[in-house]
Amino acid sequence: MSEHRAILRIAVPSILSNITVPLLGWVDTAIAGHLGTSDYLAAIAIGSALFSVTYTLFNFLRMGTGGLTAQAYGSQRHDETALLLLRGLLIALGIGALLIALQTPLLHFGLSFMSTSAPVATQAVAYYRVLIWGAPATLSLYVLNGWLLGRQDARTPLLIAVVQNLLNIGASLLLVHGFGLRLMGVAGGTLLAQWVGAALALFFALRTLRRHGSTPRLSAAFRNTGAWRSFFTVNVFIFLRTLCLVAVMFSFTAFGSRRGPTLLSANAVLLQLFTLVSYVMDGFAYAGEAVGGHLVGAGSAARFRRLVRSLFAWGASLSLLFSAVFALGGGALIALFTDAVAVRQAAESYLLYAVLLPPVAMSGFLLDGLFVGTTATSGMLLGVAVAAVGFFALHGLLAPTLGNHGLWIAFLAYLALRGLVQGAQLPTIVRRSFAPSAAQTAH
């Protein structure tokens, strides 16, 4: 199979899966928006924000599991892929149980950052307390999706995402309008979809294992302390890297809020364009992760180098296409997100930054995938940490005189630094991944 076909076999379903990610929240929002009071809508906005931050921090479960599984699968160690799945699920269930146990302090901490009325806060708490019971399922699904992707299967996660969203729509509408449960019906429909999605993913994973005669045993999962150490090391670096990402994105919004509601809204609209780019680039990053990890496990250095070239050819082409679309049709795209004249005018005055975002950000996205596939997660952390320091330093220097332009320049510099720092490390990581000692370890 050519590198281009291997990339597209993972990237296209992954992009479609990525597009479905916000749908669970959109469905809740759309249903709540027709319940007769804005309090329900505001409560879901707050609850969704709290869960978004929480689950983003634990995305390492998907990435770490995916990279390690891809390498084990590439070296035909099917028993090890089974143990990786079991270790990941044990950690996911443990974290999920901890989140449930700590829901009250976590809820109070999250709400301390929100400015809202008492009725909205009451509804947000009720919504949160229902959906927190989906934490073990959501985190387990991260592990299962990463594991399936590591085995070069991107279609099953897409199928699960579609089933989840259809079930969420149907169950939420039934509970809200059929049983009159209002906000609790919205939460209940989402909770049901989360658990069914996890159960469905587990079914497909176990079916895959049975085909290869691999059955993970709990005792075997605990026996190899070295494997646990490796699993935790890979994931700790991803977790710290995610903290840096969240800090930058949160600060971008916070810094923009100081410029008033119009610029804050304009920045939010332009970031939606960046989100669209990220869904596509992440799909190709997943391909780099899955195919790259598989080639590391198989010891195919020449094919890995061809994979890198093919990935960047796709990335460069698509990023330039996005830039052209934003440059030529940016005004129309902005109008899709808002009809507020002041916000549209402000967003259009900063449109150049959205045009520059795709090519500047492209390397960071693709290298993330390759670094996960080679389990070089310390390099990912270094790249994002250096870039984050650059963002805060540049913003401090430029914002006092350039205002919102300074914020966007700092953000572009952050994205560029991510790619540059990680790109500088790539040759060393490739040599290390395919060194004789590494190949012996993989096999």
Walk through the language-model features, giving the residues of each.
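Short alpha-helical transmembrane segments in multi-pass integral membrane proteins
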Residues: 1-11, 69-136, 167-170, 176-236, ...
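Transmembrane alpha-helix boundary and packing residues in multipass membrane permease domains
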Residues: 14, 18, 29-30, 67, ...
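Small-residue-enriched core segments of transmembrane alpha-helices in multipass membrane transport
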Residues: 161-168, 272-273, 385-394
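Residues that mark transmembrane-helix kinks and helix-interface sites
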Residues: 26, 63-64, 138, 143, ...
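Helix-terminus/linker motif at the lipid-water interface of multi-pass membrane proteins
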Residues: 22-42, 111-118, 174-181, 243-276, ...
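Small-residue-rich hydrophobic transmembrane alpha-helices
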Residues: 41-101, 138-157, 266-324, 328-330, ...
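Transmembrane helical elements of multi-pass membrane transporters/channels
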Residues: 9-28, 130, 134, 141, ...
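N-terminal transmembrane alpha-helices
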Residues: 2-35, 49-64, 68, 93-100, ...
